[in-house]
């Protein structure tokens, strides 16, 4: 004992404790020394080693008598250093090793954990986990299935290799059905060639007529419907394509090298005509303008070119129209959407106006868009509107933001509006204010309206056929015509005023002249009466004649044979 650990001096106090500590570290390094504590005092136990000592009677070293018996360590300090307090147990027989310094087994630790769960958690750093029972299902799922084994060179092995390579295997009987598993393929082969319906395009077998129709519609939609004489029935074909598009949502090109799909019938048909064709064939299919020879790929492009560059296409009669335009008209009537009754009536009126009047008077560069009337061509007068200062407008806008409404500023008017534009329109027709703007007046029937939208609606609904004046004396511009009409009305008013003044003067002339003989007075009165009758008859006949412009008209006084002052 003294040869391995060294002699411990028989001194008391702190020096003895340091020596004991150093010897304990040396024993830990050799990993053959175990430390045990008995009655809160240190005791060293050295395992039996035959190579070092020949005696077998020394199973444990003697206790150190010099270590003070009163020196004790706390239980918490010993537990922090994983030093278990020694228990009263007898040392085993010769050659046995004392188990006092060994770690407790798992069962004893669990018992200590039940007594001190928090300290156990702090000392050993073990977390409390709930006891879980193993799930038999999860264990069963984890079992990996072994790949099926088939005989070498059998059909099952060939099918399995094809499924691994391509993902599916086709039926060897019909070559139209594919399956992803060998079991599914065998199940199909039991009923193969027993279905009632077979596709005559690809040979696929189906169990029901509805399934066959859907298969043909979805996979063979490019095949046209033929008549008795092998002619394509366009209405039936369009109806079939419309049904396919409604159910599937798209039409796909059936060429193997093309994967295009379309959401409209026109786009699909346009693609089918040109898909897979060479440049020479596409060049033959182009449409050329008969005026300038410019080529176009579509009829819509050619129609736009003719409208914008070579005048309106509707001015041509049916016999004089080019073949391309006739085809366009027939296509728009036969296929596509059905026109409404109002649209047909409008087209009829436009064509009638264009063919009858506009082709004669308008320039050749006019287009069909000029047939649509705009504000300048509307036959109504606009009244003047009052002007407002910026301060007033700013005040109105502020009131709208605060109170969300504006009241009419005129006294006695309780009109309320939620916008500045509405208040402006109201002030133009409000009779309680200083400004009276007037009303909108239709020049065709002299009817008055409060708002501009009202007079526009009136003209569009009542005078729909009177957009353009159909009169041989009309000019090319509607504005010039309106100016001439205004001038004629002013001249007519001037004539009436002039006639009324002349009649008043003639009536006042006998009172101003000097008294004459009775004979001369009678003759003068008779002549005046005759002259007045002539003037009245002439005034009655004048409105029946066409009005003559003022610049070509000369006012001539009526000729009379009576001379003043002559007997």
UniProtKB/Swiss-Prot annotation:
Residues in cross-link Glycyl lysine isopeptide (Lys-Gly) (interchain with G-Cter in SUMO2): 18, 84, 227, 333
Annotated InterPro entries: Krueppel_C2H2_Zn-finger, ZNF512_C2HC, ZNF512_znf-C2H2, Znf_C2H2_sf, Znf_C2H2_type
Localization terms from the record: Nucleus
Segments of skewed composition (Basic and acidic residues): 523-532
Compositionally biased tracts (Polar residues): 12-23
Family: Belongs to the krueppel C2H2-type zinc-finger protein family.
Superkingdom of source: Eukaryota
Protein name per Swiss-Prot or TrEMBL: Zinc finger protein 512
Keywords: DNA-binding, Isopeptide bond, Metal-binding, Nucleus, Repeat, Transcription, Transcription regulation, Ubl conjugation, Zinc, Zinc-finger
Keyword Nucleotide-binding: no
Reported function: May be involved in transcriptional regulation.
GO molecular function, a single term: zinc ion binding
Pfam short name (any one): ZNF512_zf-C2H2
Species of origin: Homo sapiens (Human)
Compositional bias segments (type: Basic residues): 119-130, 495-508, 556-567
Lineage: Eukaryota, Metazoa, Chordata, Craniata, Vertebrata
SMART domains the UniProt entry points to: ZnF_C2H2 (SM00355)
A Gene Ontology term for the protein's cellular component: nucleus
